């Protein structure tokens, strides 16, 4: 997550440098008779606004989504535990209980008990 965040900031920096050093000077836009420079200018503005939107999604929506997902799975697990306590399985899923029951069965089979 930190790597993605740092890559976004590097992309911001490169785009703003490109925008303000090469494209955004009004004199170069007025001198330019071709539409390529203007297209690059508007494309870089669109790219920066898209990166800003992605940054907002990454910083605001993603943590909120993770929190909602965590709450869902936490309560879903609690609901599963309540459901499992209402309808117990015929065998134990806990390893220490299973091991102790198997030891009792082995001892009973040997005739020790």
From Swiss-Prot:
GO cellular component: membrane
Disulfide bonds: none
Subcellular location: Membrane
Signal peptide residue numbers: 1-29
Membrane topology qualifier: Multi-pass membrane protein
Keywords from the UniProt entry: Membrane, Signal, Transmembrane, Transmembrane helix
UniProt keyword Cell membrane present: no
Superkingdom per UniProt: Eukaryota
Transmembrane segments: 34-54, 56-76
Miscellaneous comment: Partially overlaps WHI5.
Entry protein name: Putative uncharacterized protein YOR082C
Biological source species: Saccharomyces cerevisiae (strain ATCC 204508 / S288c)
Lineage, broadest ranks: Eukaryota, Fungi, Dikarya, Ascomycota, Saccharomycotina
